[in-house]
Design a protein with these regions (language model features):
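Aromatic- and glycine-enriched pocket-lining scaffold segments that form the walls
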Residues: 160, 164-166
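Cleavable N-terminal export/targeting peptides
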Residues: 1-27
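Transmembrane beta-barrel domains of Gram-negative outer membranes and organellar outer membranes
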Residues: 18-154, 166-168, 174-262
């Protein structure tokens, strides 16, 4: 049980903050700032986290977009934290994410994301996490379609925890209705490749092959254009898949953000 809880927390963190979105980069010298809050709940482990965050992206040169996202973790589940991964001592700034995207063609871009280890939030244990991949997007009438394929890897290993490679892929459809409201639906998938190593509650080492273990994260949401430069966005996400990835119970994740064009 302990191993599954730590794994589910770590993989949940990987899925929580992906690339900024699945659509083309902004025009040259355009930018966006976002202020939001996320909520994660996983019943069997009593994991409940509130995650305020602040982020900004800017196209510094034609087709080149740079971004940073700063999460802050507020532990709402004292039982889980004191019993398992001790997150009660890690409330505060989470691992910042640095992101870069380059638009190769109007339909294709590549991305590179780096999680910087400033905290032991979510079981990453001070490890750098690198994600890289490509995105394809296209407009189909009233539907803006975006998709992504990427690979995430922990750049360091230690005796306490070592995670396998994670293959990420997903797609989203935004429905343009010529009104201020834009509904969207999507799903992200996570497939593990390799071994996980670590220690259980008794201090005994384990080394398990998790290749092929997977989870799918479907989500729905709504965007409301308050003004041409100000958008309110809300979404809800759940997960289906193997318990080693998502935990014993079906998790629930919600997100509310305000996006401001700059």
């Amino acid at each position: 049980m302990f191993k599954k809880l730590v794994l589910a927390a770590a993989f949940c963190a990987t899925a929580s903050f992906a690339t900024w979105d699945k659509f083309p980069v902004l025009e040259d010298h355009k930018g966006e700032t976002v202020v939001g809050v996320g909520y994660d709940y996983e019943g069997s482990s009593e994991l409940m986290l509130l995650k305020p965050y602040l982020g900004s992206r800017f196209t510094v040169a034609p087709n080149l977009e740079l971004a940073v996202l700063l999460p802050y973790y507020v532990n709402l589940s004292e039982i889980f934290c004191t019993r398992y991964v001790n997150l009660d001592n890690n409330n505060g700034l989470g691992n910042p994410e640095l992101m870069a995207r380059y638009q190769i063609t109007p339909f294709l871009n590549v991305f590179l994301d780096v999680l910087v280890p400033v905290n032991q939030s979510y079981g990453f244990y001070n490890e750098w996490v690198l994600s890289l991949g490509a995105q394809f997007s296209k407009n189909f009438g009233i539907v803006d379609f975006g998709s992504e394929l990427g690979l995430s890897v922990n750049l360091e290993t230690n005796d306490d925890f070592s995670a396998p490679l994670r293959l990420n892929f997903g797609a989203e459809a935004d429905f343009k209705l010529n009104i201020p409201l834009t509904p969207f639906v999507g799903a992200d998938a996570l497939v593990l490749m390799g071994h996980v190593t670590g220690k259980n509650e008794a201090g005994e080492k384990y080394n398990d092959n998790l290749t092929g273990e997977f989870a799918v994260y479907p989500y729905v949401g709504l965007k409301y254009a308050i003004t041409p430069k100000l958008t309110l966005q809300a979404s809800a996400k759940t997960a289906v898949g193997k318990s080693v990835v998502i935990g014993e119970d079906t998790p629930f994740m919600a997100d509310l953000k305000l996006k401001m064009a700059i």
